[in-house]
Amino acid sequence: MARIELHPDFKDFLRLLNSHNVKYLLVGGYAVGYHGYPRATGDMDIWIESSESNSKKIAAAFRDFGMPHETISESLFLEKDKVIRMGIPPVRLEVITTASGVDFNECYSHREVIKIGDILINFISLQDLKKNKHAAGRHKDIADLEHLP
């Protein structure tokens, strides 16, 4: 697996997700890099379980991270196909509620928990990442598939 360097803001946010017991998976470019194809990415993609209990936890994590209370509603994290963006590339966080071709709970049961520095991070498994990339089907997803083991 590739060595991953995280921006301090990403570390802080991941620590908050863990401290609030948020059910999440790291997907996208960071997951591709972890699974063996390091490449440039402009953001960190975090897929969350879209449930009542998890929406309360993720909203609390966002507030603790500094998002104004009035801009973060728990219902925001219950919407299908929602993308919540924070920051500017290359230090942008994208929290998503849906991922193409895969089910969150199934993927969560297959997750790989990896320690980077002092942070335990939930990564989508290689098999589930490949399913997701295949279903998404964008040019960069196909390129990722060609380079993943």
Question: Each predicted region: which residue ranges?
Answer:
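Compositionally biased terminal segments of proteins
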Residues: 1-149
